[in-house]
Amino acid sequence: MAIKALRGMKDILPPLSEKYLNFLQTASHYAHNYGFSYIETPLLEETALFKRSVGESSDIVGKEMYQFIDKGGNDIVLRPEGTAGVVRSFIEHKLDRQGGTHRFFYYGSMFRYERPQKGRFRQFHQFGVESFGEPSVYEDAAIITLAKAILDHFEIDYTLKINSLGCPVCLKPYREELIKFLEDQEHICDDCKRRRKLNPIRVLDCKNEQCQQIYENAPKLINNLCEECNQEFQTLKNLLDNEGIIYEVDENLVRGLDYYTRTAFEFVSNALGAQNAVAGGGRYDNLVEMLGGKPTPAVGFAIGIERILDLIKDKPVQREGYFIGVMLPEALNIAFDIATKLRQSNRVIMEYKPKSLKALLKGADRNNAKYALIIGEDEYNEGLVWIKDLERKEEKRVDIQNFMER
């Protein structure tokens, strides 16, 4: 019986892998332009990191982590999200003690044991950015603008939703008001019944349709913001308005992780069905301190790459580079020299087995080459190479030495 990839985990093969690399290169370029530097953290982390950051009442920690005890007796987990690991690295390398602003971007695999479905996998990929040390709401606006720039580059249709999750000052009275509301709700799902005692605000993130209808009448955090949080949210909206960024205020948007405070946002697409969030993030000013670091304001976002790839429109295949082949074995060394030189600045595919002209041209077409370079018997004897432009359908024979010296 053949061994296959695990359920919910997929190989990324051409042509999808080309689209994947193009997304990473483009997103990295935009992040660099916004002042972010690349960071890479391990796939494995201590389980305690996510229990303290994501929250023990979250679905991720409660149901979805790939958690195990290693041979050394350590309780470890395959990372389910990227932010906590970056924060851990930020603290471990004492960047929280340096002051100033530190901006990082990252990409890589994340793991969650959940039911695979469209737009949701057990191994998935994220591109994310994290900014540490800048408390200004202008940084929140810049982060949202960066995410928008990446999505706009790929001509993705989306709706931007924003909300404010307040601060500890606003949350305490709101939490009490929400608990009082939830006590009378007997038709919510079992998960929400469990959460209403452990972390009542998390119920608003429930995707159950009946629960969502009930929560339409729940008290809204945005109506309970303290003066400072309310002013900051108004400033954020003004900044987005000034940039011509269209958004909706979603009063039930709370994100799926416990560490967010104040600004929260999501980019959603109707083209994805139930799993419609393509990017999301917000501010998490308390997380660095929660994980043992010096109090540091922070804000960031993550983009789900698989969902983005589903939305990026396929473009016509562009011919690129050279296909090199020979019709006699004696010409292989010369052809190999040509390939080595061209590969310094071009994509080159070489066929090592001598074939007929017809077969070689089929190979060039199959590999979407722009040019076919072929050495037949006559070319070999005369020191020439036959070149065909497969887009323009033009062909010529040129001196090999002159071609190599170009």
Swiss-Prot record:
Q: Provide the protein name.
A: Histidine--tRNA ligase
Q: Does the keyword Transport apply?
A: no
What's the EC number here?
A: 6.1.1.21
Disulfide bond residue pairs: none
In terms of Pfam families, this protein maps to: HGTP_anticodon, tRNA-synt_His
Q: Entry's NCBIfam families?
A: hisS
Entry keywords, A to Z: Aminoacyl-tRNA synthetase, ATP-binding, Cytoplasm, Ligase, Nucleotide-binding, Protein biosynthesis
**Protein family membership:** Belongs to the class-II aminoacyl-tRNA synthetase family.
Compartments where located: Cytoplasm
Catalytic activity from the UniProt record: tRNA(His) + L-histidine + ATP = L-histidyl-tRNA(His) + AMP + diphosphate + H(+)
Task: Please tell me whether the keyword Ligase is annotated for this protein.
Answer: yes
Known partners and oligomeric status? Homodimer.
Please tell me which top-level EC class this enzyme sits in.
Answer: ligase
Report the superkingdom from the record.
Answer: Bacteria
Q: Which GO terms describe its cellular component?
A: cytoplasm
Its BP terms in the Gene Ontology are:
histidyl-tRNA aminoacylation
This entry's Gene Ontology molecular function terms read: ATP binding; histidine-tRNA ligase activity
